[in-house]
C-alpha cells in the first residue's frame, strides 16, 4: 500500500490536536436533514440530525497551532453550558476521537472537524465539570 502525503498530513494534525486542552469560545446548535437508507427494505428517507458546533481556540504553547480557532461538530442535542456562562467564565475541553471530516477546496481552505464527545473543565481545574 502506497502512503499518500495527504493521509500522512491528516494523521499528523489529528495526532497533534487530540490531546490539546481547548478554550471554548462559543456553541451553536444546529439541525440538518440527513438521507438514510432503511436496512430492511432499502427505502431512502430524510432524518433530522441534531448537533452542536463548538468554536474553540488552541491555547498558546502549542507551537504552530497556538491561537488557532476551529469548529468541532458534536452529535448532541443540547450543549450543557449557556452562552451567558461562556461569557462570564472560562471553560476548556479535551475532545474524544477528534477527526478531520472535510477540507474545503475554496480559497479559505476551511477544515471541518467532528468528535465523539468531550470533557469540559471550568477555568483551569483538573476536575471534570461535565463529560459528554
Model-found features: residue ranges?
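OB-fold and OB-like single-stranded nucleic-acid-recognition modules
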Residues: 1-132
Amino acid at each position: 500500500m502506497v502512503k499518500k502525503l495527504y493521509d500522512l498530513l491528516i494523521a499528523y494534525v489529528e495526532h497533534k490536536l487530540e490531546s490539546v486542552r481547548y478554550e471554548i469560545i462559543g456553541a451553536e446548535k444546529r439541525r440538518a436533514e440527513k438521507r438514510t437508507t432503511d436496512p430492511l427494505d432499502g427505502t431512502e428517507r430524510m432524518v433530522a440530525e441534531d448537533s452542536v458546533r463548538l468554536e474553540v481556540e488552541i491555547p498558546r504553547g502549542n507551537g504552530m497551532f497556538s491561537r488557532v480557532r476551529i469548529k468541532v461538530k458534536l452529535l448532541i442535542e443540547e450543549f450543557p453550558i449557556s452562552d451567558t456562562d461562556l461569557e462570564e467564565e472560562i471553560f476548556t475541553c479535551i475532545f474524544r476521537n477528534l477527526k478531520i471530516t472535510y477540507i474545503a477546496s475554496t480559497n479559505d481552505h476551511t477544515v471541518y472537524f467532528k468528535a465523539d464527545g468531550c470533557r469540559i473543565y471550568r477555568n483551569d481545574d483538573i476536575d471534570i465539570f461535565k463529560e459528554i
